[in-house]
Amino acid sequence: MGEEAPEEYELGGGEDERVMEWETGLPGADELTPLSQPLVPAGLAAAFRIPPEPGRTLLDVHRASAATVSRLRRASSSSSSSFPAFASKGAGTGADEAESGGGADGGNGNTNNSSSKRARLVWTPQLHKRFVEVVAHLGMKNAVPKTIMQLMNVEGLTRENVASHLQKYRLYVKRMQGLSNEGPSPSDHIFASTPVPHASLHDQVPSPYHPHPHHHSYNNAAYAATVSSYHHYHHANH
């Protein structure tokens, strides 16, 4: 059996295909057991009736190495592309923001890994405008993260994203009403990009009670009639 591979045979493209960090700590060529030497001595193999292994050549080793390198490269490339970039539905989201989750995922990757990695979401003016419209529709008091997320219907948007933004938005509305100095500044480019609807401002601060004028007149007339009846009864019995 030959010990050398044909000169024209190359391991997946030669030196360019070598991954040097995978070779760190491996024994050198002079430290390896020669291919011609069996791992089990002949006497021991005969005693235990172990059939001899077929001989291996350098060509066999190169083929096995090429197959291993190919499998490792495929596994590495598939794992790096399994978490795709975030794409929003018509609302223009960006790449990152602090909660994440789930976020920045884009179209054709393996969704099984999306729960273990949460990219961060950027609130753009378009996405914030959609958020404001949904909050105005629900009413500030009734707006909760889960319902907002469902009505916005934006791919990659998580409940945590919405909860954080809703908290900031409520502080922003209070600041616009002059009730607080906390929250985003009125000049914040995201929050200022969409004016706060009048209904949201009105909903945040309960209006004082004002009795209806007709109701007020009715009460006065009823009181006057009661007093008149009392005086008439009092004079009739004296």
Curated annotation (Swiss-Prot):
Low complexity bias: start-end ranges: 71-90
DNA-binding region: 115-174
Gene3D superfamilies: Homeodomain-like
GO CC annotation, single: nucleus
Family annotation (Pfam families): Myb_DNA-binding
MF (Gene Ontology): DNA binding; DNA-binding transcription factor activity
GO biological process, one term: rhythmic process
Inducers of expression: Circadian oscillation with peaks at subjective dusk.
Keyword annotations from UniProtKB, A to Z: Biological rhythms, DNA-binding, Nucleus, Transcription, Transcription regulation
Region (Disordered): 71-119
Subcellular location: Nucleus
Record field: compositional bias (Gly residues): 100-109
PANTHER family: HOMEODOMAIN-LIKE SUPERFAMILY PROTEIN-RELATED, TRANSCRIPTION FACTOR BOA-RELATED
Function: Transcription factor that is essential for the generation of the circadian clock oscillation. Binds to specific sites on CCA1 promoter leading to CCA1 activation.
Name this polypeptide is given: Transcription factor PCL1
Gene expressing this chain: PCL1
